[in-house]
Amino acid sequence: MAAPEQPLAISRGCTSSSSLSPPRGDRTLLVRHLPAELTAEEKEDLLKYFGAQSVRVLSDKGRLKHTAFATFPNEKAAIKALTRLHQLKLLGHTLVVEFAKEQDRVHSPCPTSGSEKKKRSDDPVEDDKEKKELGYLTVENGIAPNHGLTFPLNSCLKYMYPPPSSTILANIVNALASVPKFYVQVLHLMNKMNLPTPFGPITARPPMYEDYMPLHAPLPPTSPQPPEEPPLPEEDEELSSEESEYESTDDEDRQRMNKLMELANLQPKRPKTIKQRHVRKKRKIKDMLNTPLCPSHSSLHPVLLPSDVFDQPQPVGNKRIEFHISTDMPAAFKKDLEKEQNCEEKNHDLPATEVDASNIGFGKIFPKPNLDITEEIKEDSDEMPSECISRRELEKGRISREEMETLSVFRSYEPGEPNCRIYVKNLAKHVEEKDLKYIFGRYVDFSSETRRIMFDIRLMKEGRMKGQAFVGLPNEKAAAKALKEANGYVLFGKPMVVQFARSARPKQDPKEGKRKC
């Protein structure tokens, strides 16, 4: 006879690795990086909430700190929990979930009892029941697990909302105004549904269901029963009347709900805007002639006439040619004028008859004046500047000695040997001879012809000597005064540097010859 089978020895500790790995696959997960704020009980409840059958939480120290082993009833439940828990952010920590390896199975929890394992392997019907029970407890089958609603949905529950009305919409608007979160969620929903934004002007009111509510038609008059039909008993009459009422109410409700759903699904029709063609009216000549004046914007400002704003065109005519002769008349003219004055005085002493006799005829004829002399006088007057700079303006436009020391142009400044010719440098590009004549003309007496001829200005505008000038003055005294007053005067944004010229030769006088300064 065969020897009786000996029972397998089972240790008191954890079972072997073969007991942890069922033939269908592994069902133990290793959960890492659990939050330290949670206690061991809270960690165990968390993993059991995701369908774990048994949980073992390890200590908060060592290599496997803040970790836990979770055993699930089967491989599918373990895979589903892994997809839900892996990379889940919890209290600032990101969970890392993986299947437990063979080297880590020493720390895995032991099954609660051997009888449960035998029951699962022997009875597949009970295993299916457990699956169904776990299915109701998992997170995916809940109503809103993110908000804490984990109980399952009722499959028999259906919602049927009434169509929108003015009172319902008013209540919704009041709720939007009182609950800011609800208002924000409504805006999010409108954005997702690509609805127009409500931030613009008020849109047209869509057609409401209340406007299309059908009025109940009056019931048709009941015809009297024919005498041929025998009257029914009272019980049959009551049953038939109840059945007809039930059928009529059901049909009315169905028709009413169908109409409500059709109206709810209808989109609001926007009113069509009819564009009116504007016919431009032709203006008549009368209207164009009598154009009304535009009212003034304010009564404070007077109305300006075109003559006040624009220059009136002057009539073109024969222009008179005039010669502006200076007061300095030649000696010949003075002698003639003195003779005429003496003659007039003598005529006053003569009787009136003699004076009248002298005035009879074409009058007196004077000799023709010398035109060359008048033209020379005119040229001399053009060369003379009408105005010269004053001493106050020179002092005001000069820079101080402290500023001269800071500028590089005046660092190695030396006035030079005194003579009647000065040298000016550091001139701006826009400087012209008339500007220098305006400044240095105050040191020349233009009434003297010799001094006026000796006054000479040569401005260099090109080449290596650009921005420099030589000014010839009548004498050394005038040159020294000009150097003292004009040195450092700012002309067109640049201070002038005035020095005595090295070789000073005055301009030769054609009448008197060479003169030494």
Curated annotation (Swiss-Prot):
GO terms for MF: pre-mRNA intronic binding; U12 snRNA binding
Gene3D superfamilies to which the protein is assigned, alphabetical: 3.30.70.330, 6.10.250.610
Residue ranges occupied by any RRM domain in the UniProt entry: 27-102, 420-503
Keyword entries, A-Z: Nucleus, Phosphoprotein, Repeat, RNA-binding
Record SMART domains: RRM
Subcellular location field: Nucleus
Annotated region described as Disordered, given as residue ranges: 1-26, 106-130, 213-254
Comp. bias (Pro residues): 217-230
Listed InterPro entries: Nucleotide-bd_a/b_plait_sf, RBD_domain_sf, RBM40_RRM1, RBM41/RNPC3, RRM_dom
Acidic residues: compositionally biased ranges: 231-252
GO CC terms in record: U12-type spliceosomal complex
Keyword Nucleus: yes
Gene Ontology biological process terms from the UniProt entry: mRNA splicing, via spliceosome
Post-translational modification Phosphoserine, affected residues: 21, 108
PROSITE patterns attached to this UniProt entry: RRM (PS50102)
Ribosomal protein keyword on record: no
Biased composition (Basic and acidic residues): 115-130
Top-level taxonomic group: Eukaryota
Subunit structure: Component of the U11/U12 snRNPs that are part of the U12-type spliceosome. Found in a complex with m(7)G-capped U12 snRNA. Interacts with PDCD7.
Biological role: Participates in pre-mRNA U12-dependent splicing, performed by the minor spliceosome which removes U12-type introns. U12-type introns comprises less than 1% of all non-coding sequences. Binds to the 3'-stem-loop of m(7)G-capped U12 snRNA.
PANTHER family according to UniProt: RNA-BINDING REGION-CONTAINING PROTEIN 3
Protein name according to UniProt: RNA-binding region-containing protein 3
Source organism: Pongo abelii
Organism lineage string: Eukaryota, Metazoa, Chordata, Craniata, Vertebrata
Gene: RNPC3
